[in-house]
Curated annotation (Swiss-Prot):
Regulatory DnaK co-chaperone. Direct interaction between DnaK and DjlA is needed for the induction of the wcaABCDE operon, involved in the synthesis of a colanic acid polysaccharide capsule, possibly through activation of the RcsB/RcsC phosphotransfer signaling pathway. The colanic acid capsule may help the bacterium survive conditions outside the host. This is Co-chaperone protein DjlA. Residues 1-6 are periplasmic. PANTHER family: CO-CHAPERONE PROTEIN DJLA (PTHR24074). One of its GO terms (cellular component) is plasma membrane. It comes from Haemophilus influenzae (strain ATCC 51907 / DSM 11121 / KW20 / Rd).
Amino acid sequence: MEFIGKIIGVFLGWKVGGFFGAIAGLILGSIADKKLYELGSVSSSFFKKKTTRQDLFMQTSFAVLGHLSKSKGRVTEEDIQLANQLMIQLKLDDAGRKLAQDAFRRGKESDFPIRQVIREFRIGCGQRADLLRMFLQVQVQAAFADSELHENEKEVLYVIAEELGLSRMQFEQMIAMEMAARAFTQGGFYQKYQQGAYQGGYQYQQQNSGGYQHASGPTLNDAYKVLGVTESDEQSTVKRAYRRLMNEHHPDKLVAKGLPPEMMEMAKEKTQQIQAAYDLICKAKGWK
């Protein structure tokens, strides 16, 4: 029951301090509900019977990463290094690293039940749309880690998106947004932009193999794609899109909903991309 903390908090607060006590109880109860949700147990037939939402997020992420690596034909040394680098970046302890390694190994298996795993993950996350979207973005970012999205990887990502409730059009939009967003982290762009030292352009090129590979620095068109807007949209529309995306990717809010704290840096990077894209549009349009 998601609201048990609020109910108890309001009841006890009212008994102790009347109206203002109830308000205080509601606030404390809300905090308790978030913590209970974050640490609450969920069932997973693939990993183990009971686990926390945060461990489920972590294990599912690495299992899918293993599956994505295998989808290209074979798992390369580069794929394994990427997984290890991600574990280091997330600062996993020994127990967390073992969970991640086991999940990655199981994800590489030919009979990995991708749809079943994602369905259980979706249920375990309580159908939280922003958390599910963040999960998919983690996988998309991992697929682009070698600066190329293989067609087989794209099909696996679409299976995940489909199980998470996204349409093909929504999925294609997310891929386009991610390709554009990567322009804002390549070569330390965000830091350069903050210092006013950025010059140049950026575009993605489609390869003959059916995959995608980036070229060099971000364009205004990339910025529009990151926010999911068009050049003709009014300032109010662009601002609404910017605020919505910043709210969806707020690291603290995502952690409260079940994102492992170790993945906060990924969420922060996403907000930096969104901020840089919005700033670029405002500068080009002369908006304050």
